[in-house]
């Protein structure tokens, strides 16, 4: 978690949920504009079980529309040549599996398009992990990026990205309410 002082109190930021929101909005913005894909140095072949291969066939066009360059490769494999640049740090196999696997949290995404559901699953895997140590610069960048989001208070699954503690609440907790 990141603790950040605001003008009238303190914000506790869940770095995973915040980064998930940031990545989600960047990918949706790219999907609605010019998609930037990162070509892989070498195409990656990923073997899929029958149900994932079926999911791939059903979602192939969606994957293409969000920045993947992917095609069937034999009976039980796919070949990935590019991934969305926003998630270029994520393992290619993990990105594909995140896109294709069903997630229990998808039920919270009823109003979202299939593209946004897939993007949400990918961002969940691509986001900074809870407990991961971030440098001060990384924390500051995360906070700035979150401030620029359209919906900075929740991740795409609806969990809060931050908790606000007012100066009055802090003063009460420290027994200083009447001492000002």
Feature names for model-found ranges:
Residues 1-180:
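Long, charged low-complexity intrinsically disordered regions
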